[in-house]
Amino acid sequence: MPSPTIDPAIRARLSQEALKGMSFLEHLEELRRRIIWTFVYIAAGFGVCWWWHEQIYDFMQRPIMKALAANHLDQKLVYLNPTEPFNMYLKMAFIAGLFVASPFVLYQVWLFIAPGLYKRERRYVLPFMFSTVLLFLGGGVFGYYMVYPNALTFLIGYSHQFSPMITISEYTDLFLTIILGLGIVFEMPILVFFLALMGIVSAGWMWRNLRYSILVIFVIAAIITPTTDIMNMCVFAAPMILLYILSIGVAFLVHPKNRRKRREAQEAQEG
């Protein structure tokens, strides 16, 4: 005999009632369970990346090797401390493990918060998680293939009268600063999404202040660009300007005033 189908609205209401019926200790127990699974996934991600740490390092050092080869220099990094290579591998495997584990960690976050959300709120969560990961990866890919190689080639070529002695720790820190920094910069639409959802900013306000925003973007690009040339600064600034324009569209879609107008128009059309 087939099991009866439960109406989604009833299921959501039952889930809300079950959540409200949970005691404080039960909430803590649920949180503890999700935290444990989060650490399990991070440890598993670290283990996988440690197993492949040499391949990951080869991928990470490719930009500097190309820059050194382009300037006819010895393609080898150095270290000044016996523990430096091992510590570098640990740091690299841990950060790469966080990337690998991030979808599973976000899923644990979803399992913890989902019972406390209404249906209209849940529809934002999964697109938010997907967009966050996608934008961060987009920033990292842009930095790895576009910004970082050009910056390294310029910097090493600019100081051709000196012999570089680049340590693996210094290179790793610079690599992570550029890649992670651009990944965070690419999260601009997510930040605007929440600000617009709370009514703090609007699409109209962002559009009216476009010229000032572009000026601020170029100032930020000048600060975070590792070189002093205008070309690399423009390479940094161009995607941020595009992300700002995309954020205007996001603000228009989610601002409470615009959502209320669309709902009223839909009700008037249906009526």
Swiss-Prot record:
| InterPro entries membership | Sec-indep_translocase_CS, TatC
Q: What is its main location?
A: membrane
Concerning its family, UniProt says: Belongs to the TatC family.
Give me the segments passing through the membrane. Answer: 35-55, 93-113, 124-144, 178-198, 213-233, 234-254
Which source organism does the UniProt entry give? Koribacter versatilis (strain Ellin345)
Q: What is this protein called?
A: Sec-independent protein translocase protein TatC
Q: Name one GO biological process term.
A: protein transport by the Tat complex
GO cellular component terms? TAT protein transport complex
Where found, per UniProt? Cell inner membrane
Record note on quaternary structure: Forms a complex with TatA.
Q: What does this protein do?
A: Part of the twin-arginine translocation (Tat) system that transports large folded proteins containing a characteristic twin-arginine motif in their signal peptide across membranes.
Q: Which residue spans adopt a coiled-coil conformation according to this UniProt entry? A: none
